[in-house]
């Protein structure tokens, strides 16, 4: 049986900051610049669709 239900293509991501090792959950299609809450480093930048992730992705959350 084929599943025809529509699912969103956007996901939440667990990322780790390259500077302070802080783990944070961010939205993969964010419309604003996302910074680390501890050190202020840019983690993701918007591109009109999916965000450009500038740090290490630990896990893709469903």
From Swiss-Prot:
The keyword Zinc applies. Pfam families: Ribosomal_S27e. Zn(2+) binds at residues 17, 20, 36, 39. It comes from Methanosarcina acetivorans (strain ATCC 35395 / DSM 2834 / JCM 12185 / C2A). One of its GO terms (cellular component) is cytosolic small ribosomal subunit. It comes from the Archaea. Belongs to the eukaryotic ribosomal protein eS27 family. InterPro entries: Ribosomal_eS27 (IPR000592), Ribosomal_eS27_Zn-bd_dom_sf (IPR023407), Ribosomal_zn-bd (IPR011332). A zinc finger (C4-type) spans 17-39. This is Small ribosomal subunit protein eS27. Gene3D superfamilies: Zn-binding ribosomal proteins (2.20.25.100). One of its GO terms (biological process) is translation. Part of the 30S ribosomal subunit. Keywords: Metal-binding, Ribonucleoprotein, Ribosomal protein, Zinc, Zinc-finger. The gene is rps27e. Its cofactor is Zn(2+). One of its GO terms (molecular function) is structural constituent of ribosome. Binds 1 zinc ion per subunit.
């Amino acid at each position: 049986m084929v599943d025809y239900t529509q699912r969103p293509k956007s996901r939440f991501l667990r990322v780790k900051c390259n500077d302070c090792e802080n783990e944070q959950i961010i939205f993969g299609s964010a419309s604003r610049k996302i910074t680390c809450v501890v050190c202020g480093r840019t983690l993701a930048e918007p591109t009109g669709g999916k965000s450009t992730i500038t740090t290490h992705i630990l896990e893709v959350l469903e």
